[in-house]
Regions:
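Hydrophobic transmembrane alpha-helices and their immediate loop junctions
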Residues: 1-249
Length: 249
C-alpha cells in the first residue's frame, strides 16, 4: 500500500479547483468531491491489482484519477473492460451506502457529475476506454485507435462549443483532455508497432484465430494466419520476417 501511495500525484488542475472552491467557502463540497474521486480511482486500482497489472503512476484530476500502467498492450480485452468500468461501479456502490447517512444535498450532484464526465467518450476517460474495447471486438487494433481518437476529438469539439461561456473549469479540463487525445493520436503508429513487437517477443496464448491478408487487420485477443501472395504464413513467421528486416523499434 505504501508503494502505491508513493505513486500518487496531484495534478495542478486539481489544486486550482480545490483553491477556487475553498475561496468560495465550499468546504463540504470539495471534501465529498475528493472523497468520491478517490473512491472511484480505488475501484480501478483494486481490480487492476487482481489482474496483477503494474502501476506506474496515479494522477488525481478534478474529474477523477488517471492511473498509468506498465502493462502489455496485448492484455486481454475482458481485463481492460473490467478495469475501465470498475471505477464507476465502485463509486456507485459506495455512494448508495453513504447517501443514507450523509445530510448534504449536493452529494448526488457530485456523484453524477463524476460518473457522467468519466463516461464521456474522450480518451483517456473511462467512456473512451470502454468504447475502445468495443471497437477492438469488432475491428482491428489499428482501426480501434483511430476511431477512439476521432470520437474523442468530436466530443471535445461539441462540448467546447456548449461550455465555453458556461463553465470555465470544465472547459479547462477539456483543454487537458485535448492534449491527451492529441498525444494518443500522434503515438498511434508507435502503439501499433509495440502491439506487434510484443507478439514477436512474448509467448502469448490466444484461443481464437483469424485469417487475414494485411498486418493492419490484426486484432487483439486473436492469433492470426496470413495469406499473402498465394501463400499461408503463421503470425510468428510473419513477425519474424518483419522485425528481422526492420530491426528493433
Amino acid at each position: 500500500m505504501k508503494n502505491i501511495l508513493n505513486k500518487i500525484y496531484l495534478h495542478p488542475l486539481l489544486l486550482i479547483t480545490i483553491f477556487i472552491f475553498i475561496l468560495m467557502g465550499r468546504f463540504k463540497f470539495i471534501l465529498y468531491f475528493m472523497l468520491l474521486i478517490l473512491v472511484h480511482e480505488l475501484g480501478h486500482i483494486l481490480v487492476s491489482l487482481i489482474f496483477k497489472w503494474k502501476i506506474d503512476k496515479i494522477i488525481i484530476l478534478p474529474f477523477g484519477g488517471l492511473t498509468k500502467y506498465n502493462q502489455l498492450i496485448n492484455t486481454p480485452l475482458i481485463e481492460e473492460f473490467l478495469v475501465s468500468i470498475s471505477g464507476i461501479l465502485f463509486q456507485t456502490f459506495f455512494y448508495v451506502i453513504i447517501n443514507k447517512y450523509i445530510d448534504y444535498k449536493y452529494v448526488y450532484l457530485i456523484h453524477y457529475f463524476i460518473i457522467i464526465f468519466n463516461l464521456l467518450p474522450i480518451y483517456p476517460l473511462d467512456g473512451a476506454k470502454i468504447l475502445n474495447v468495443v471497437f477492438n471486438k469488432i475491428t482491428s487494433f489499428k482501426n480501434s485507435i483511430l476511431l477512439t481518437a476521432i470520437i474523442s476529438y468530436l466530443t471535445i469539439f461539441f462540448l467546447s462549443l456548449i461550455l465555453f461561456n458556461i463553465n470555465k473549469i470544465v472547459f479547462m479540463l477539456l483543454i487537458f483532455l485535448f492534449i491527451e487525445v492529441n498525444n494518443f493520436y500522434k503515438e498511434r503508429e508507435l502503439l501499433f508497432n509495440k502491439f506487434l513487437f510484443e507478439r514477436y517477443t512474448h509467448s502469448l496464448k490466444f484461443k481464437k484465430e483469424k485469417l487475414i491478408n494485411n498486418v493492419d487487420k490484426m486484432k487483439k485477443d486473436y492469433k492470426h494466419l496470413f495469406y499473402i501472395d498465394n501463400k499461408y504464413m503463421t503470425e510468428n513467421t510473419f513477425l519474424k520476417k518483419r522485425f528481422d528486416i526492420k530491426g528493433n523499434l
